């Protein structure tokens, strides 16, 4: 056989006898097999042949094999023929060295040397001898058979002529987990997410907390040298959290070009600097009204604005127009400048400026700032004067909420509204302005909530700021520590600060005025809001609410510093500081607290069985406090100081009601003193009603009480009996009297009023349209609507027709004749009434309460109030009417009403409600005007 035909193969030759017959059986399937797949053949000596492309083999071994060496042939070699091998069957399976039973599953007997695997010499990580195969090859793993573990090729791969590959990986083999094990791992994953979300500042607290073990580790998988305690949260997730914190912010979403809240607020604040400029008066009027504001309004009730800063910014034109409009609106009532004054009443002069300022403020409730808050407080005071109870109540509530939103109830050193995280330290003047604005909200809450069923919103313990400093310290910017409302000192002075050591000396009129109003708020809460009924102790007991309030009122006046105690010298000192009105107002409030507490004991004599000694002492304190208030008002008038605070007018009203009681006293000296003090108080109330509209109602109430007391004196009543019948009028009750200002709606004839469904009643129950028979006969029958135009058309001709038809019989079927007779009677009664009282009504400007009433129903013709806007010109006669009480006034003969009853003291005066005769006691040439 020619070997040139098999250049690509090297066979192990055994010298077969018939080579030609086997030439056609050469296995060509391994013709292109790489020699590297059979590494065991590389050590053998191959036959040198020039035709081998893979390299030249040594000739020695080749020749040796060709010569028929006795060495056993390699049956794995390509040169061997399995079909001619006697130890193989027709399927190529080896059958050499088989013994009985092997084909039935037995194991061949091998030597001990051959049974030792190749990997037995390897050691484990612990240094022990390895007993198990560390890693099986990929083909054996796929076929799921036992791998011998030899490298680079195992025994199975060599027999099967397939590549033997071992997968080398660094991942540890972990046991398979079932579904329950996966559920156990979820809490651990959730815990890791929570830890990643913890801020950096909270890591110190979380670092000491060990993480819980969700599932115990498999025994043997955790080395014994590893500690069992888990790592802390900071150690495990600290780098990740720090990297997350330092990561740049996410880019803005495309299309989201809307402005942020901060940008909107800054835009509104910039707009506030120019909005309302077109409504401002001239520069001269602005400066004039600013001086009027600081002379008549500042310090009386509210200590708002810093005068040097305000005037400097006003001249420079850097003030927001809304603030200038607000100041001009509230100050216009006190000026006599002809450019500001109008034909209407004084308390309505600044309404045009106030309307512009009110519109600007109410649109900015979303963006609170100190400017809007100050405007709300001043506008609330202005609406108080214009009898707009609803507006004043709403503006006060909005101001209180805004003050808490700005954190004015806290004494902060830095501005809480710092932009971009910057902290701006507040100066002393800025901190004092913030304190005074908050205290103004506190005072407004006490004033507005003093009426019945109006609880107070601000608790005293929520305000953690000191009281205002003296006025001169505030004007000149001199820091000084003061006490809080409860007497604590938040910042006690040190010897090295250079401040005044006595904290009470740093407190001026404003601080003690706030304490007086706070005490008055507690007293009114106890008397008018049900706290008095909850007191189980009698009034004269030392633990009762009454005695606690009485002691607080007396001790507050006694605790004043020497510079604030009332004296002529201290009044002159305050004149030099331009604060005499504030000084007088503070002492009026202190006396009013004593009057209020003591008068409550007088009213409760019969109800609680008060002892005579206790009642006598309470009566003495009440009359002394009332006299003291009148003396302060008289001294203010003599010294040229006008106390313009509205609450001072209410104190004068309370004092007046006590003087009216003293008129029927059997003590001549008390009676004379009461008459003189009553004159002083009524003159002061007449002056106040020009600037604050609600005092028209109080003046009429005083007139009613005076008439009722004179009627009671004729009936033989004494002071004690009259005091128990007296119901006390609260300061905040004017809200119910004037909820929406002065309008004709509150004087409308109820018989002609047609019920309409309003939008405010949309959620309430539907009212029946029909009336029962009982209501049909008891309620007055309303007039027909079609008669209204006829009555209005005939009104201008009434007087002329009355003159023509005097003495003529009335023709039947003419409704005008009945109206003429009614009008004639009303006019005659009007002249009798005005002549008897001596009211100076002249010309067209005179007030005509009966002619101005509704002519549709004469039964309601006497209910018109002199404060109707249709008759505002009637207010002018009060300035020219002399106000005095002559001695003959006590001898006037006032009749009772038709039923013989005496009206209560707190009712409004109703014209025509008393029978009077001008010839008996009212026609002696004396003039009486309240």
From Swiss-Prot:
Origin superkingdom: Eukaryota
Gene3D superfamilies linked to this entry: Zn(2)-C6 fungal-type DNA-binding domain
This protein's record includes keyword Transcription regulation: yes
Pfam family name, one: Zn_clus
DNA-binding residue intervals: 137-164
CDD domains: fungal_TF_MHR, GAL4
UniProt KW keywords: DNA-binding, Metal-binding, Nucleus, Transcription, Transcription regulation, Virulence, Zinc
Gene Ontology MF terms: DNA binding; DNA-binding transcription factor activity, RNA polymerase II-specific; zinc ion binding
Alphabetized InterPro entries for the sequence: TF_fung, Transcription_factor_dom_fun, Zn2-C6_fun-type_DNA-bd_sf, Zn2Cys6_DnaBD
Record-annotated membrane-spanning stretches: none
SUPFAM superfamilies: Zn2/Cys6 DNA-binding domain
UniProt-annotated location(s): Nucleus
GO biological process, one term: DNA-templated transcription
GO CC, alphabetical: nucleus
Induction info: Exclusively expressed during infection of common bean.
Further remarks about this protein from its record: Multiple copies of the gene are present in highly virulent fusarium oxysporum strains.
Functional note: Zn(2)-C6 fungal-type transcription factor that has a role in the establishment of the fungus within the plant and/or the progress of the disease. Regulates the expression of virulence factors such as SIX1 and SIX6.
UniProt xrefs under PANTHER family: ZN(II)2CYS6 TRANSCRIPTION FACTOR (EUROFUNG), ZN(II)2CYS6 TRANSCRIPTION FACTOR (EUROFUNG)-RELATED
Name under which the protein is recorded: Zn(2)-C6 fungal-type transcription factor FTF1c
Gene that encodes it: FTF1c
């Amino acid at each position: 056989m020619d070997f040139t035909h098999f250049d690509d193969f090297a066979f192990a030759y055994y010298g077969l006898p018939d080579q030609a017959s086997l030439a056609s059986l050469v296995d060509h399937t391994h013709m292109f097999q790489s020699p590297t797949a059979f590494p065991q053949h590389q050590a053998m000596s191959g036959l040198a042949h020039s035709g081998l492309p893979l390299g030249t083999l040594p000739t020695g071994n080749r020749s040796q094999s060709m010569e028929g060496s006795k060495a056993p042939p390699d049956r794995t070699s390509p040169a061997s023929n399995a079909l001619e091998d006697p130890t193989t069957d027709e399927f190529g399976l080896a059958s050499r060295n088989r013994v009985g039973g092997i084909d039935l599953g037995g194991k061949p007997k091998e030597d001990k040397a051959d049974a030792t695997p190749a990997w037995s010499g390897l050691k484990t990580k612990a240094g022990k001898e390895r007993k198990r195969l560390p890693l099986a090859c990929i083909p054996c793993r796929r076929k799921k058979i036992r791998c011998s573990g030899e490298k680079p090729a195992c025994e199975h791969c060599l027999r099967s002529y397939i590549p033997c590959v071992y997968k080398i990986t660094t991942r540890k083999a972990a046991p398979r987990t079932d579904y329950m094990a996966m559920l156990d791992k979820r809490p651990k994953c959730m815990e890791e997410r929570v830890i990643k979300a913890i801020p950096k500042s909270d890591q110190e607290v979380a670092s000491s907390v060990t993480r819980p073990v969700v599932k115990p580790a498999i025994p043997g998988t955790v080395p014994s040298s590893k500690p069992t305690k888990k790592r802390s949260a900071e150690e495990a997730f600290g780098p990740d959290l720090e990297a997350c914190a330092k990561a740049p912010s996410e880019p803005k979403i495309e299309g989201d070009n809307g402005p942020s809240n901060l940008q909107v607020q800054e835009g509104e604040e910039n707009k506030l600097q120019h909005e309302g400029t077109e409504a401002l008066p001239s520069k001269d009027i602005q400066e004039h009204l600013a001086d009027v504001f600081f002379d008549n309004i500042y310090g009386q009730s509210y200590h708002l604005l810093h005068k040097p800063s305000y005037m400097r910014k006003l001249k420079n034109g850097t003030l927001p127009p809304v603030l200038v409009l607000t100041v001009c609106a509230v100050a216009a009532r006190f000026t006599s400048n002809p450019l500001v004054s109008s034909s209407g009443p004084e308390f309505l002069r600044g309404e045009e400026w106030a309307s512009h300022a009110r519109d600007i403020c109410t649109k900015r409730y979303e963006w609170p700032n100190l400017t809007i808050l100050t405007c709300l407080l001043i506008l609330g005071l202005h609406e108080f004067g214009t009898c707009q109870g609803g507006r004043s109540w709403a503006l006060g509530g909005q101001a209180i909420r805004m003050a808490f939103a700005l954190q004015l109830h806290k004494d902060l050193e830095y501005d809480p509204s710092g932009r971009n995280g910057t902290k701006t330290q507040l100066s002393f003047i800025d901190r004092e302005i913030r304190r005074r604005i908050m205290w103004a909200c506190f005072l407004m809450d006490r004033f507005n909530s003093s009426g019945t069923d109006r609880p107070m919103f601000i608790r005293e313990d929520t305000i953690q700021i000191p009281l205002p400093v003296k006025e001169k310290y505030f004007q000149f910017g001199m820091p000084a520590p003061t006490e809080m409302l409860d007497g604590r000192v938040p910042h006690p002075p040190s010897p090295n600060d250079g401040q005044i050591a006595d904290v009470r000396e740093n407190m001026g009129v404003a601080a003690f005025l706030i304490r007086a109003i706070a005490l008055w708020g507690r007293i009114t809460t106890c008397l008018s809001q049900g706290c008095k009924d909850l007191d189980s102790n009698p009034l004269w007991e030392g633990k009762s609410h009454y005695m606690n309030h009485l002691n607080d009122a007396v001790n507050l006046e006694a605790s004043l510093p020497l510079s604030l105690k009332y004296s002529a010298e201290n009044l002159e000192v305050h004149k030099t500081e331009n604060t005499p009105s504030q000084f007088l107002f503070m002492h009026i409030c202190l006396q009013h607290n004593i009057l209020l507490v003591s008068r409550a004991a007088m009213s409760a004599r019969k109800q609680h069985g008060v002892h005579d000694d206790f009642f006598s002492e309470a009566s003495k304190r009440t009359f002394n406090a009332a006299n003291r208030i009148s003396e302060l008002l008289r001294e203010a008038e003599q010294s040229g100081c006008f106390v313009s605070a509205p609450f001072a007018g209410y104190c004068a009203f309370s004092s007046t009601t006590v003087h009216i009681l003293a008129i029927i006293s059997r003590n001549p000296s008390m009676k004379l003193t009461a008459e003189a003090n009553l004159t002083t108080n009524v003159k002061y109330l007449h002056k106040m009603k020009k600037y604050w509209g609600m005092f028209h109602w109080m003046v009429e109430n005083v007139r009613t009480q005076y008439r009722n007391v004179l009627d009671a004196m004729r009936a033989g009543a004494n002071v004690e009996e009259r005091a128990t019948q007296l119901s006390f009028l609260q300061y905040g009750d004017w809200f119910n009297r004037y909820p929406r200002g002065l309008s004709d709606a509150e004087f409308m004839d109820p018989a002609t009023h047609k019920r309409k469904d309003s939008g405010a009643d949309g959620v309430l129950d539907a009212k029946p349209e029909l009336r029962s028979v009982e209501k049909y006969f008891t309620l007055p029958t309303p007039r027909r609507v079609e008669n209204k135009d006829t009555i209005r058309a005939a009104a201008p001709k009434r007087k002329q027709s009355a003159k023509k038809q005097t003495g003529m019989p009335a023709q039947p079927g003419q409704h005008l004749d009945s109206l003429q007779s009614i009008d004639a009677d009303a006019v005659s009664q009007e002249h009798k009434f005005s002549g008897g009282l001596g009211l100076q009504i002249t010309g067209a400007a005179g007030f005509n309460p009966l002619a101005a009433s509704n002519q549709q129903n004469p039964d309601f013709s006497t209910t018109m109030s002199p404060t109707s806007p249709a008759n505002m010109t009637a207010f002018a006669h009060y300035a020219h009417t002399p106000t005095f009480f002559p001695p003959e006034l006590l001898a006037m003969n006032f009749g009772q009403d038709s039923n013989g009853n005496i009206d209560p003291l707190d009712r409004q005066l109703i014209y025509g409600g008393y029978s009077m005769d001008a010839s008996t006691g009212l026609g002696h040439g004396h003039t009486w005007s309240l």
